[in-house]
């Protein structure tokens, strides 16, 4: 170990001990929670590949609203629909802020995006632009040709590999990345491969354990250990690529195609003005990074889980394939066909319920002292909503940890944020604005995979033997990538 690293750790240890010894004892009526260790509090209880399950298990013992001390960060976790409603509806404005983190400040241009920006007028106006201009249902439909073109390419690749195992996980990640990059940046990103590589490094960084996140006084460790320099280098790589994209879009001028990508929209809004603040290139780049980071991991993970559950339940696979093959006329699926694929939509909803793409929603921060369920929540408290625990709440769902798409038949519950037993995209002011876009990247590809191909497990593997061990980063995915065998069905073989 380097001498500088040893000195840093010694200084950090002394700081932590001093913090623990001198911390005042609160007299507030905080929610109950597990016992806290000296100095670290409850940090050790979140060091798990599946923290949403750990927190659900703790909530069963200590209650649906629970207090954890994560280093210096006072944290409240809610794990039932009733308490989620308290946070995201009843007291939504009190919990509309985001905690400030070093990484969000670096990667998202001082948190000038939509996901990490503090609650206020800037965030409200940018969210409005996002909702009305960038990710409206009409705008998402306008990208249908991009999705269709990419699925056509994927289908040809699968046809050429029919009968041999393919890595379904890698394939869907590539597909989702291609669509999101083209819809966001158009054809002008010459460095897409580098961009995607750096984006995944950013996602890993955002979800990685960082001691200074729990002890703000230890930010110097990020400098001494070289982490901050590494993050700044990554941000510079992203900025250089996005700067080239903006220059390319501006150089097109009146020669632009009829298809407006999201950068076109943001530059148009910037040039038009009419807001209470001046939109800068940094604002544009921050929002573009939101689009790129928010959709890539979550959409591909949802597709992976949906196909995994169908491989584990062959009767569901057959029912879904029978439906799509009876609805589609010709050899091409259009997005209008999706409206008639009722069972497929049930499969997607059940996948989102049981395998919430972000099981612990993006953290919120309490803006002011308030009271929830009889407990004091001090200002600046970090709030975690366990969306997965809400989606598997036994008081809300029968047999909650089983995959049963039929539970949504004739069921009015949906994922739009009004039903707190089902909040894969969040709810309230901070609900994910990319909900419609994200769904388009799951339903349409899944319909294509089920229509054009039959599927089997490799090497004689039985459905119940398929490993469904989870691992959590930004989203929760399979620990071991899904490898399956595409086969061209006789009914549509050429």
Curated annotation (Swiss-Prot):
Protein known as: Costunolide synthase
GO MF, one example: iron ion binding
Keyword flag Iron: yes
Reaction(s) catalysed by this chain's protein: germacra-1(10),4,11(13)-trien-12-oate + reduced [NADPH--hemoprotein reductase] + O2 = (+)-costunolide + oxidized [NADPH--hemoprotein reductase] + 2 H2O
Pfam families associated with the record: p450
Membrane topology: Single-pass membrane protein
Positions with a binding annotation for heme: 432
PANTHER family (UniProt xref): CYTOCHROME P450, CYTOCHROME P450 FAMILY 71 PROTEIN
Protein's organism: Cichorium intybus
